[in-house]
Amino acid sequence: VYSALKRLLVGRPIATSELEHQRLRKLVALPTFSSDALSSTAYATEEILFVVAAGTSSLALGLSRLVPISIVVAILLTIVVLSYRQTIYAYPHGGSSYVVSRENLGSKASLVAGASILVDYVLTVAVSISAGVAAIVSLPAFRGWADQRVTIGLCLIGLITLANLRGMKESGTLFAFPTYLYIVTVAGMVLYGLYQIYFGDDVGRIPFDAEQAEIQREAGGSLGLFLLLRGFSSGAVALTGVEAIADGVPAFRKPQSRNAAITMMAMAGILGSLFFGVSVLAHHIHPVPSHDETVISQIGRTVFGEGPIYVILQLATVAILTLAANTAYADFPRLSSIIARDGFLPRYLGNRGDRLVFSNGIIILAVAASLLIIAFGGITTALIPLYAVGVFTSFTLSQTGMVVHHRRVREPGWKLGLAISALGATATFIVLLIVAITKFTVGAWVPLVVVPTIIALFSAIKRHYTRVAQALEIKPEEVRPQPFNHTVVVLVGRIHRGVIQALGYARSLRPQHLVALYISHEDDDREEIQRQWREFGINVDLEIVHSKYRELTTPVIEYLEELDQRWNNDTITVVVPEFVVGKWYEQLLHNQSALLLKGRLLFRAGTVVTSVPYHVEGYGIVPSVQPKASAAVSPNGAGDTGAKPPKDADPPDRAADTPPAAR
């Protein structure tokens, strides 16, 4: 049932040899890796206005500062993109901030970069989905759904998670159309709106109360500068996601670096044009930032009216904001796999799933983003202050690493590259300080606490793997024959076919000592098992331990301790007879004592636990291992009694309800 459902939802497994065919051409890679950056045009202008035009009394001031702030953000975008373009060529196998920092700045810097960018990817999903839900509830037909933001957001995360579990190529193709639709509709809105403003009939303005605008202007001073810097730090979210292409170079078709560089420059041109165009329109149209309707919705409604083009704009906005999370879904699992291979994350994060994607990383990302959506109620503005700290930390470290790279490698034109990287590192570090200071009290403190915590977790995981490797390390001279004392203990309940097979298996191990152990709860149990043992003529020592609390695991462990003292064992093998019923739901009718016992014994040193399954199909019995002709076993492996179970022996399912042979 599980396998069939998995194939239906995720698709057929893909062979490793097909990995090359899963790589992306530029037209598909652009929406796959750029949807995060491009989608920020749907809320970056709004976030600037939310801060600088805090309330209607300062809207005029905010609008007067909007275009200059947007110009500065566009210049910063140009610097960062030019710097990352060099990273693409320098690191064709993936130039994430983590890799660049590790190669040039050392392990500690790479851990800071890795933790920061992982947090950023989680926030990318949470912010994009929250903004997408805001676009949905901005439509007049759906404004009554505003109180269902969290539920809608979780459903969207579920859908995009499922799409990514199906594989990079399928998800990229799926996401291409909505991304290009958004680009066309927003570009059309900007061009048509600007044409109407400068060459046609003025599109008009959204009314607002500007009575106290001069009061805000006159306030000036440090408060005015603080608001200006805070607004700039909010607008800087437009840069989130621009590094994704540099991270995902291995996903491009060959020549990978060239195709990735072309895609990044195209993304930067589109992003800068749309962001600046929306800001200019906002400057003329005077939208009022509100949680009830987004700024881009107000602009679109003013330019297009409430007709079908406006609806298409909103649907395209919802689509790209939802799909913007795909950038994080593409890069979070890949970065996690790199960090895992370095030993700082669990190694299973480095394994590809059936569809050649890092399934474990995808699932972890989905869970983390869902928790953020729930914690912050799906409100985009509440999540934004958390967003920029990780982004600009990774930007700064990556570009600082490229400065060191240029000085070390000194490739042709390295001085120009060094200058660009140094300028980028300086600019992004200044932005990081602005974000941390101006937004500390409204949420920027969270990543400043979470990132060091993740770094501590990285270090703890690395120490664990190092200790395990040291404990397992062995030298050639240590490998030599030595005495080995082996005892096998077979856990038995009532005698049935599974027990007989388990005894035969135990004999085949040829141990120095072989015993059968029965845990009794009542005196009648003791007498019954002794009677059966004599009746079947089993030539294996039977030892009976009474459990006064009717428990299985503790008496078994205490008995094993006694055997270690008695025979000075190197290893004890505990053989657990189990039967497997034909239908999965039939398993619910039987206790799970053997499973619990195996879990406890796993942590006992010098103990091996072996299950001997016996498959029951209907009223017939199909053994998983053909038993010996004789059921009788001697402790030293010699001599059989030839005894066989009688026809009136207990049926397997009745016998299995008596521990420890139950399953």
Language model features: what each stretch is:
Residues 49-102, 106-116, 127-156, 268-272:
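Extracellular loop-to-transmembrane helix junctions
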